[in-house]
Structure formats: C-alpha cells, structure tokens
Amino acid sequence: MKIDTSLNMPQLPEALSQAGLQFSVATEEDFDEIMAMSQDIYGGLDYLPTRYTSWLQDTNRTVILARKHGKVIALESVCVIDDGETMLVEGLRVAPQERGKGVAGVLLRFCAELVKSRYPEVKVCRLTRDDQLGPKDFEKYRIITKQGILLMRFRAEDLKLHLSEFGLEGDNESTLSTFCSSPPPVRLDHTAIQQLYLNSDLLHGVLPNATIIQDWQPFKLLPSNMAILLKKEIDWMVDDMSNPTVASLCTFPFRVPIGDDWYYLNIDMFGKDLALARQQFLYHLQRHTATLKGHVMCQMFLDPPLWKAMAEFCHNTLSVELVKEYTEQCVVECDLI
C-alpha cells in the first residue's frame, strides 16, 4: 500500500512533536532540494540520483522528508520486506548544518511510528552501516552479519589493458578459464536463481547468516524478497550449480556524482574460497567494464578474512588504487516496540 503525499500523521510521542520538524512524503518536485542538501554524502558515491524516481514508484517503499522552517533538512527511505515483517531503512541523510543535533534519530523514530501505524505486522527495523559501532549501538542493535569492504578506483581503459595482459578482454567467458585453474563460473538465469536460493539449501552455508546482501540491502531467503531482487539489473554467479562454494551478485554500473564520467560498480561476494572469489571478481570486472569509458569506483563486500589477500591482489596485480583501509559493512536490526 502506497502512502499518499498528504501523509496522515501517526500519533507521535511528545518528544517528536516538540522537535520542531515537519514531515512529508517526498515527491518528484523535491528532488533538486534534496540533492542540494546531499552534497558530498557517501564520499561522492550517492546512489539516490539514479534511484529516486524508482523509489517513489515502489509500492513497498515510502521516502520521508523532514523540514525545518520549510526547508528540507533530512531524508530517509523505509521499505517493507521479509514478507512484511521487516522495515528496511535506507538513504538516510541530514543537511550539513543540522548534523549532530539528533535530527536522524527523530526522523528514524517518526518513520518507525509511521510504518507501525500502516503495517502493524512489521516486527523489526533493519539497516546496514559502515561506521564504527559503539557501546550504545550494541545496546540498541543486534548484529545480523558483517562483511569486509574493499573500495578501489581505476580508469576503465587502464583496467581493460591489465585484464588483456591475462587474456581477459571483452565479454568473453572462455578467456577467463585460461587464467584460473577452476572451471569458469556459472552466470545464473532467473530459473537457476530460484532453484539455488529458494528451492534448495545449497547456499545456506555460503551466505552470511542465510542473508542475501545486495548493494547494502539485506534480504532473507523468501520468495517475496526474490521478487524484488529479480526486478533489478544484477548479475548472479556461482562457481558450481551442484555444489556452490562461492556466490556473487554484481549490480550493473551506474553514474555517481563524484565527478563527470564516474561510475559505481557494486559486487557482493559470499563464500570463503579466495581463488574462487577472485575468479568471480575478475569475471564481473571483465563483463561490466568492457563498454565503460571513464573512472570507476568499485566496492566489493566479502568475507572479512579474505580482505587482505584480495586487497593485495587488486593493488599488486590489477594495479588499481585502494581508496581506504579495511572497514566493515554491518547489518544490524532492532525490535520495533
């Protein structure tokens, strides 16, 4: 059910009603004002410009704005997933001049009240973070799983030259097998995805806590979630259909506001075998940089113990620039009371 933009307010706790903020559902007309207060967010890797319109059209999602004196100062998106039991929080941003004043907490509480009033079956709030969790966070949240974050940048043209040195060029699967001793990975169609992820338990030990994390979004293994994922432009891959050890999802590249001709490539890697993870990583790079021209920020999420060796491979063998040291992507949740 889509909440209309008039937004019938839930009965708010007194602390929220006294916060001096006005809340509304975002519309297309708000886009420019939202982006004006979002400068430099997420290190220039903001996905909102490419997803804003589709978010507004998503029947399971509501994008909420907080205003102060009529000006947009914060945004948060909430999406109901997991068969209606989970409120997924995404896209949170607060205007620079309002940060550190508790605005994010007020907006999150408002969204929780709104979702509970509209979807009483929702039980938990889930979100994905990459900052350092402190003692207060552990009092509030349960950690569902974590992945290491490997962020790198390169020029697409330079990377293609390095890949060609290994015989990896163009969209050619057969060349990949000449560089890796294992058989080439299997790219899955929708039927194979359903079979592996929903109709068998073959991937339960590969996925962290039986959770699919796709571009910061954590999903339980449920048909309703798979329906959401299969609408997206994603390459799904495993090393072996009959006995998978490593699985990966690569979100198709999209432009980001870090600068002209900059793209973002997101790769979610699951499994503990370094050689197989590296093989699938190379395949995704080969496939998705073949037609790109310009700069690419590539972010790969992988099992934390694999991070160091994969980072060394990226730097020493592929000659890409590592943007930052080891950080973690943490999926956390709390009960909606």
UniProtKB/Swiss-Prot annotation:
Q: What else is known?
A: Strong histidine N-acetyltransferase activity has been detected in ectothermic vertebrates and not in endothermic birds and mammals.
Keywords associated with the record: Acyltransferase, Transferase
Q: Which reaction equations make up its catalytic activity?
A: L-histidine + acetyl-CoA = N(alpha)-acetyl-L-histidine + CoA + H(+)
Name the source organism.
Oreochromis niloticus (Nile tilapia)
Function noted in UniProt: Enzyme responsible for the N-acetyl-histidine (NAH) synthesis, which is a major constituent of brain and lens of ectothermic vertebrates.
Protein name per UniProt: Histidine N-acetyltransferase
Q: Which InterPro entries match?
A: Acyl_CoA_acyltransferase, GNAT_dom, Hisat_C
On tissue specificity, the annotation reads: Expressed exclusively in the brain and lens.
Q: How does activity depend on pH?
A: Optimum pH is 7.0-9.5.
Q: What class of enzyme is it?
A: transferase
Q: Which residues form the propeptide?
A: 1-2
Molecular function per GO: L-histidine N-acetyltransferase activity
* Gene of this entry: hisat
The yes or no answer to whether the keyword Transferase is present is yes
